[in-house]
């Protein structure tokens, strides 16, 4: 669909140039797109990877002619650092709307708690914001200028529960009957866990035997892992957001003889699959660990993954890179539809998008419902195999089959 749009608008531009219509033939000044994400502090790494995805997306769009409806105007990325606290994120959003009044749209802000704070500010400024954050609350506030490309935490939990049980049974393991939950208290994690406990565990025949919440950064994982050792659940739902917390928990599980598949471990979110996890945790320690994520570089993205590695040294393409890359194409489509670099027009255009399936997000369509959620947004299940987190579900994106750790 993007190719057809580019071809059509390219012909229109050529015709306009021949007819001497200066408004169509002359490119406008650059169109500024914001990326508001952590570039410093504890969460700097994910924010920097989001920047990589945005840069590649803008590079590709500009190389293919920019925004045809605006005379080939090029996109320009403006990066705003949220820092590493909710208060800093809110201040960054206030600074963004004050210092960059020409922004037509933005993407960000990584942690759901940051995105909740940022969008309180951007909503008042009528600035459309795309986000890969998970929390259900993001699109339950009646806001009109936030657009959630990821499946929400609750949706991911609903989709993943029967899928995980099927993966276990299809791999020849016994059907899980007991489950432990160890989670941090970030907004996305709490949203996922609430949905599990309220609506999903009992219908799936799962008994909750450990239910622990901690505040990052975690100082000592021993008390949490001791409860796992005492109960020996059939499955562990493991929801850290910070890599250092994941490291402490995995190390302690291995120390207590519970790691490397002895308790099948399922994480939600990408912290457990970040490349720099291997800087401090061995590949053997994470072998078999599964993660449910909203997006991942998968089958069909090989060329993009290769570019990311060549340009930035990234060994694989996490959600932060591919979703932010895709966001640039959403904003291009909206600008083409809007026909002007105006934030209100762009927001209206995003609400009206109906582009069918997207190559940059799993499941569903490039279309948003009245709350701002992407229609039919799916999920991706990845698993550490031989030192790399690879896609094992859905089948159309999988690069290998899942291996379910045996009890």
Q: Where on the chain are the PLM-derived regions?
A:
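Twin-arginine (Tat) signal peptide motif
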Residues: 1-11, 16-21
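Sec/Tat signal peptide C-region and signal peptidase I cleavage site
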Residues: 21-27
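Extracytosolic ligand-binding ectodomains
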Residues: 2-8, 27-407
């Amino acid at each position: 669909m993007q190719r057809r749009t580019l071809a059509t608008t390219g012909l229109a531009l050529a015709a306009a140039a021949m007819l001497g219509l200066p408004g169509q033939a002359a490119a406008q000044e650059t169109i500024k797109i914001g990326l508001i994400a952590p570039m410093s502090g504890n969460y700097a790494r994910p924010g920097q990877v989001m920047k990589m995805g945005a840069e590649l997306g803008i590079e590709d769009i500009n190389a293919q002619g920019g925004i045809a409806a605006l005379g080939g105007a090029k996109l320009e990325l403006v990066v705003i650092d949220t820092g590493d606290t909710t208060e800093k994120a809110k201040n960054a959003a206030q600074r963004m709307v004050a210092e960059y009044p020409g922004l037509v749209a933005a993407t960000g802000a990584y942690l759901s708690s940051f995105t909740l704070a940022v969008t309180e500010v951007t909503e008042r400024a009528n600035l459309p914001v795309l986000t890969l954050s998970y929390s259900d609350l993001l699109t339950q506030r009646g806001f009109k200028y936030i657009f959630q490309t990821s499946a929400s935490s609750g949706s991911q939990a609903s989709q993943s529960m029967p899928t995980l049980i099927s993966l276990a049974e299809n791999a020849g393991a016994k059907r899980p009957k007991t489950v432990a939950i160890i989670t941090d208290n970030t907004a996305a994690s709490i949203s996922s866990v609430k949905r599990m406990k309220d609506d999903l565990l009992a219908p799936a025949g799962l008994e909750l035997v450990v239910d622990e919440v901690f505040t990052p950064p975690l100082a000592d994982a021993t008390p949490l892992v001791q409860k796992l050792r005492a109960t020996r659940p059939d499955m562990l739902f493991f929801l850290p957001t910070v890599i250092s917390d994941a490291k402490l928990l995995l190390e302690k599980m291995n120390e207590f003889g519970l790691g490397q598949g002895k308790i099948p471990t399922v994480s939600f979110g990408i912290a457990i699959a970040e490349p720099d996890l291997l800087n401090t945790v061995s590949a053997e320690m994470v072998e078999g660990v599964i993660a449910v994520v909203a997006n991942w570089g998968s089958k069909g993205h090989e060329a993009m993954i290769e570019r990311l590695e060549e340009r930035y040294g990234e060994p694989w393409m996490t959600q932060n890179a591919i979703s932010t890359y895709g966001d640039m194409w959403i904003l291009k489509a909206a600008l083409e539809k809007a026909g002007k670099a105006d934030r209100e027009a762009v927001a209206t255009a995003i609400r009206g998008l109906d582009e069918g399936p997207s190559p940059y997000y799993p499941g569903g369509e490039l279309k948003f419902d009245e709350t701002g959620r992407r229609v039919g947004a799916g999920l991706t299940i990845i698993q550490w195999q031989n030192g790399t987190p690879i896609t094992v579900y859905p089948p159309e994106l999988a690069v290998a089959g899942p291996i379910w750790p045996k009890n």
